[in-house]
């Protein structure tokens, strides 16, 4: 009953904002009839992106989160809708102070007074999934306490079940649905949002990222206090910084904006290629700038619920793809897509090369500083999808992160030339990958595994030799079978030739006899003779009959 009432509310909001107009035009007849009542509602004087954004906000935090996810999929969602969904606000009414305190005490097994020297009952922030308060530990360290909103898991499960039903219907009943894979999008959302409900997972991500950038001038990650962290409660160091979007404050302290923008790019490539562990939710709300050293500014990152990593093969192919693309070597881009397995092996390299050239050439006619690096990557993947490229979740995360970093960098410093930072980094990374030191590191890394398998080598060699011997014994039989097959093929060809000769002979006989054959038939009863039929026709008929008898 609750699910039915929720569905009614969703339909009412969809009708109010006429979201039926966002659906594909080629809907089945039943669906078209079902949506007819929507046309009774007036047309809102809003763009389609605004209508979708407001509908998400009216439907609550789960749909807000889903809209935010859609804003990270410009490969599937039109650009004007992506732009509007980026403005979705994830601010919701805080849950009760008493409830917050009860959850903390229940999870930590102690009263707030026993764990904290002071505790601010007013929330610092309240979002759809969690709420944050500030506190001070007994030893004087300032912390923030993040608590999962009570009962949110049931709300999420209910709304996702409804979204999945709609997605399956759209995918099964529309051509656009089959192309856009809405079920896959909702499943991706379900994985993402349920990961966000596990604060120990987020804490582990934060610890890893902090270790990767420990003592780095580029990025600071606050410390997690594991002794006070549980699945639904996270306690970590409180940071003080300037929101990265507060340009007035950054300029007031004379921050080197060019360096700040370039360091953002450097952080991205360091995470993706050197650490192979990247913060995949680097939107402006999760990034701050330290007050110290404005001439060499340092970023501060929070909220590590979503992270990504690539396989070593994907790292390698991505680096080579980016370098080839900016050299305008479209042939190599196409070859790398096939070689990496991103597109099926049956795809013609020449066709993919032509498609990539068509998309990229207009972009590269601009000055480098005006080129959107993320947009190039997006166009590349969008083109590859036309050639059956499977959706790679980690590459989608990376693309989304790059869009955020580049957009932020251009906001800080409009003349940012991302390629000037990326090119030497990628060249250096590829060179180091095959450096003797790197190869030695790989050898040491896999040596224990190889040593463990070494005792099996004699058996593997023996089995291999045994198989070769079996192949040797099989060879004469294969040769014999080949000869038999060839003989059968030759016999079949001879039979076919005879059939053709037979047909031609009879056809020739009939053709030669035709002028007098009719006369012979007319006098059949009286003469029982075909004396008027030309002799050549008898000869051809005899040849045909002989060939037919021989083939039997």
Swiss-Prot record:
Q: How does it sit in the bilayer?
A: Multi-pass membrane protein
- EC id: 2.7.-.-
What biological process terms from GO does the record include?
Answer: regulation of ubiquinone biosynthetic process; ubiquinone biosynthetic process
In alphabetical order, the GO MF annotations are: ATP binding; protein kinase activity
Q: Which residues bind ATP?
A: 124-132, 146
Q: Where in the cell is it found?
A: Cell inner membrane
* Keywords attached to this entry: ATP-binding, Cell inner membrane, Cell membrane, Kinase, Membrane, Nucleotide-binding, Transferase, Transmembrane, Transmembrane helix, Ubiquinone biosynthesis
**What domain of life does the UniProt record list for this protein's source?**
Bacteria
List the GO cellular component terms: plasma membrane
For this protein, the parts annotated as crossing the membrane are 22-42, 501-521, 530-550
* Catalytic residue positions: 281
- One of its Pfam families is ABC1
Which protein family is named in the record? Belongs to the ABC1 family. UbiB subfamily.
Q: What functional role does this protein have? A: Is probably a protein kinase regulator of UbiI activity which is involved in aerobic coenzyme Q (ubiquinone) biosynthesis.
From the Swiss-Prot or TrEMBL record, give the protein name.
Answer: Probable protein kinase UbiB
- Which species expresses this protein natively? Cellvibrio japonicus (strain Ueda107) (Pseudomonas fluorescens subsp. cellulosa)
